[in-house]
Amino acid sequence: EELYIKVKSGTSIKEIKEELDKKNQQLAFEPNDFGFLFEGESNEGTIGGVLSINFAGPRRFKVGSARDHILGFKGVNGKGEIIKSGGTVVKNVTGYDLSKIITGSFGTLSVFTEISVKVLPKADLTKTLIVENPHLKKGLEYLNIALGSSTDPSGGVFYPEYFRSQFVFNDLTTEGPITAIRIEGSKLSVDERINQLLKELNVS
């Protein structure tokens, strides 16, 4: 099965995620969802907007930015000319990769009309290790250790106490700052890596 999608630039991230979920696939660069911050619907932004600003989420340090996942596009430049670049395979460009130049240009070089993007299979299991109530220095120390660890986390964040009122963390009811570190992979692998990470962080 081909690991790419070809979509119109105005397609919402929500719609793309719903279709990819059916095939157990994902946008690996994981664009953040800020809809709830602006009292909007979740993931109502478009794939064209995401690529125009080269927007990526927590998995960026592992898999790269949105720019690293675009395979090709069609668009319109400032002269009204239709342009296209790339295709639907990874090695499809010689010389300048126009797709990567346009991505992140905020629409100043071209406006996307159609985009081909690489997708990846979802992990079998995802778990998030949460360390409660670290002060800022300790929380950042945990992140530094974890993100450089052989446990290969796919995301990490420190939430200060004043952020906690803005988010719901499943069944976590305690207050105070937290450090969260995400591990993905097969069930056996994830459990082993979580245990190893607990030892490396010296927490229980």
Task: Please provide the spans of the model-predicted regions.
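Noncatalytic alpha-helical scaffold of FAD-dependent oxidoreductases
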Residues: 1-204
